[in-house]
C-alpha cells in the first residue's frame, strides 16, 4: 500500500484542529509541505514532547509526505525558543540526510494558526475564505506526522499524546487510548488541585469547555490538551455561553468603538477584511438576526474569524467578547447556508510585526501563566478498563460500525469503517476487551 492508503486504513486525522482526515488532505499536489510544530497555546506541551522524543519519526514522515505531494519545500515550523526541540530535529535531519528545513518563529499568539504559518514560512497569504492549498501549501500538525509514521508500520491511530495541566497536582504529558475518560486522565496527573473546577479540552484560548461525565468527556483523535481550571476567574467567563441578545445589549451599552479588537486581530493583520469593531457596532443596533445577516458586508466577514480569542481575551478594554459574537454568527451562517461572496487575495498590514501579541503576555492576561509545566521527558501511560469511542471524531461521514455487542476485540481491531475515499476516518479498538455498546459510541470493556 502507498502512504495515502496506509493513513486511510489507520484512520489518521489532523491532531491539531478539526480532525480533518489526513488521507484527504494529503491527496493533493503542492509546492510546500509544512509541519506545524509551533504549539502556540499556553500550557500545551504535547508537541514539544514529541519533537524531543520522536524527532526521527517526524522527519521521516515529513520527507515521505512531501515526496508524495510533490513538494519542493519541506519545512518544520517551530518556535525559536524551543532550543532542545530544534536540536533534536536538526540531529534527525542530519542523520537522515533529509531535505527538510527548520523554520524558527517568534513566540506570539496565534503563531500556530495555519494561515499565519503559511505567511511566516512562505511569504504567501491564503485568500479570504480559502485554504493553504489555494497557494500551493499543505500544513499538518506534528502529532499527525507521528501518527502517520505509525501508520507506515501498519499501526492504527488508537493512542493520543495529551497535555494534562492547569490546576492539577502533577502536570504531565500522557498517552491514552481513544475513548479514555477525561477524569482518568486528570487522575493520572495527580488529580485536581482545587475543589471547584471545570475542564477544557484543548488549549485555554481555543479549547472547548466539556462535561467530564458526558460523551464529550472522552479522549478523541483531536484531544491535544486537558486543562483543569478553577471556577470564578476570567477563564470561566471566557468559556461560558452567551446568547445573541446578551451580546447585543453589552455591545450597545459598553462598546466604545476604539477598534483595538480590529487592530490586533491576526486575520485582519494578514489583510483579511475582518473588522470585529464594525461587527459589534452592527450587532448593537440591529433589530434582529435577519437584519444583521441580510447584507454581504462586515457582518458576513465574521466567517473569516479563526476564533483565536485575541479580541476578547486581550484587546478589548471594556471586557466585551467579539469572538463569541463571531462564533455565533459563523454558526448561524452555516446553518442558513449563507456564504460571504468573494475569495480575494490579501496583503498583510505594514505594521503587522508590531501588533503581534506575545504568548507570555496573553497567558498572563487570561490567568494561566502561574501554572507549572510538565516534567520534561516523562510520559504517563494510561491503561483504562473501559473506553467509549465516539463515532464522530471530525468532519465528514460517520463510520459504520462493523462490530456488535458481545464481540471480542484487541487493540487495532477495526470497529467502524468509512467507504473508500470518503471524507471521514476509520475507527479501531484502543484496548482489549468486549464490545458492550454500539450506538453513537462504541463502548469496550476490558
Residue ranges and their predicted role:
Residues 11-27, 313, 423:
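Conserved phosphate/anionic-ligand binding catalytic regions in large, soluble enzymes, centered on
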Residues 16, 43-44, 123, 290-292, ...:
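Flanking helices and flexible, charged tails adjoining ferredoxin-like Fe-S electron-transfer domains
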Residues 35-47, 168:
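Gly-rich Lys/Arg/Thr-decorated short loops/hinges at beta-loop-alpha junctions or inter-strand turns
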Residues 52-69:
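Histidine-anchored nucleotide/phosphate-binding helix
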Residues 75, 80-184, 188-195, 200-204, ...:
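Hydrophobic alpha-helical positions that pack around
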Residues 176, 220, 403-409:
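Short, well-ordered loop/turn sites that connect or cap secondary structure elements
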Residues 195-204, 214, 222-229, 287, ...:
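Beta-strand/loop-dominated core regions that host nucleotide or nucleotide-derived cofactor-binding catalytic loops
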Residues 229-252, 262, 267-348:
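Ferredoxin-type iron-sulfur electron-transfer modules in oxidoreductases and energy-metabolism complexes
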Amino acid at each position: 500500500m502507498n502512504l495515502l492508503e496506509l493513513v486511510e486504513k489507520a484512520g489518521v486525522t489532523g491532531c491539531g484542529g478539526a480532525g480533518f482526515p489526513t488521507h484527504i488532505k494529503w491527496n493533493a499536489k503542492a509546492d510546500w509541505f509544512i509541519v506545524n510544530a509551533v504549539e502556540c497555546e499556553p500550557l500545551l506541551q504535547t508537541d514539544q514532547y514529541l519533537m524531543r522524543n520522536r524527532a526521527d519519526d517526524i522527519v521521516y514522515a515529513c520527507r515521505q509526505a512531501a515526496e508524495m505531494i510533490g513538494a519542493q519545500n519541506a519545512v518544520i515550523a517551530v518556535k525559536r525558543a524551543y532550543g532542545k526541540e530544534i536540536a533534536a530535529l536538526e540531529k534527525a535531519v542530519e542523520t537522515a540526510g533529509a531535505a527538510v528545513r527548520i523554520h524558527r518563529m517568534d513566540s506570539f499568539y496565534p503563531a500556530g494558526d495555519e494561515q499565519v504559518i503559511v505567511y511566516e514560512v512562505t511569504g504567501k497569504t491564503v485568500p479570504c475564505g480559502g485554504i493553504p492549498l489555494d497557494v500551493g501549501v499543505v500544513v499538518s500538525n506534528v502529532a499527525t506526522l507521528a501518527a502517520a509514521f505509525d501508520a507506515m508500520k501498519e499501526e492504527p491511530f488508537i493512542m493520543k499524546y495529551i497535555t494534562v495541566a492547569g490546576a492539577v497536582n502533577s502536570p504531565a504529558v500522557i498517552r491514552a487510548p481513544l475513548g479514555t475518560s477525561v477524569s482518568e486522565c486528570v487522575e493520572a496527573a495527580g488529580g485536581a488541585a482545587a475543589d471547584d473546577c471545570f475542564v477544557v479540552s484543548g488549549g485555554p484560548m481555543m479549547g472547548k469547555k466539556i462535561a467530564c461525565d458526558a460523551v464529550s468527556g472522552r479522549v478523541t483523535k483531536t484531544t491535544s490538551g486537558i486543562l483543569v481550571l478553577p471556577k470564578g476567574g476570567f477563564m470561566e467567563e471566557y468559556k461560558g455561553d452567551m446568547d445573541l441578545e446578551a451580546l447585543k445589549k453589552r455591545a450597545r451599552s459598553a462598546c466604545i468603538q476604539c477598534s483595538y479588537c480590529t487592530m490586533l486581530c491576526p486575520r485582519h493583520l494578514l489583510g483579511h477584511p475582518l473588522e470585529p469593531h464594525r461587527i459589534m457596532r452592527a450587532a448593537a443596533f440591529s433589530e434582529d438576526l435577519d437584519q444583521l445577516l441580510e447584507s454581504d458586508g462586515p457582518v458576513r466577514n465574521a466567517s473569516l474569524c479563526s476564533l483565536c480569542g485575541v479580541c476578547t481575551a486581550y484587546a478589548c478594554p471594556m471586557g466585551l467578547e467579539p469572538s463569541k459574537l463571531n462564533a455565533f454568527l459563523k454558526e448561524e451562517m452555516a446553518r442558513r447556508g449563507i456564504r460571504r461572496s468573494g475569495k480575494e487575495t490579501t496583503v498583510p498590514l505594514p505594521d503587522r510585526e508590531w501588533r503581534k501579541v506575545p504568548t507570555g503576555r496573553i497567558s498572563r492576561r487570561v490567568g494561566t501563566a502561574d501554572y507549572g509545566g510538565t516534567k520534561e521527558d516523562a510520559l504517563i501511560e494510561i491503561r483504562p478498563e473501559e473506553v467509549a469511542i465516539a463515532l464522530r471524531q471530525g468532519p465528514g461521514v460517520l463510520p459504520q460500525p462493523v462490530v456488535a455487542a458481545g464481540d471480542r476485540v484487541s487493540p487495532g481491531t477495526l470497529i467502524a469503517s468509512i467507504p473508500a475515499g470518503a471524507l471521514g476516518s476509520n475507527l479501531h479498538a484502543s484496548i482489549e476487551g468486549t464490545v458492550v455498546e454500539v450506538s453513537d459510541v462504541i463502548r469496550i470493556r476490558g
